[in-house]
């Protein structure tokens, strides 16, 4: 599956969860077009409510439903980098991971730009 097709499929899934997803960015080998047969899909995820902590996001029922829908729709493994809360968001933006996301990232979903 090519990057464009992957992004469209991911967007369809993400758009079903506007109550929990604020922004989703594809990064890593798929965003660079360097994926191999065993490549996982790397996603950076910000919640729709930026005040919600990372721990609360990960334990929410809706987030678990979102994860299951990803795994049900793809044969690949996922690496979901989910960050919430002001402190965690500020911290991740000072890391090499963030530099990679900025450099290679492909926006999959942004709740603020979705049409209702």
Name the predicted role of every residue range.
Residues 27-29:
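Glycine-rich beta-strand-to-loop/alpha-helix junction loops that act as flexible
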């Amino acid at each position: 599956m090519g990057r464009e097709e992957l992004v469209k499929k991911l967007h369809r899934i993400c758009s079903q969860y506007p109550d929990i997803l604020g922004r989703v960015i594809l990064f890593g080998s798929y965003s660079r077009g360097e994926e191999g047969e065993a490549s996982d899909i790397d996603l950076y995820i910000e919640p729709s409510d930026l005040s919600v902590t990372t721990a609360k996001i990960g334990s929410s029922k809706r987030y678990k439903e979102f994860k299951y829908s990803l795994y049900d729709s793809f044969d690949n493994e996922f690496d979901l980098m989910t960050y919430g809360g002001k402190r965690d968001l500020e911290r991740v933006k000072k890391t090499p991971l963030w530099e990679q996301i900025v450099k290679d990232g492909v926006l999959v979903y942004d709740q603020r730009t979705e049409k209702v």
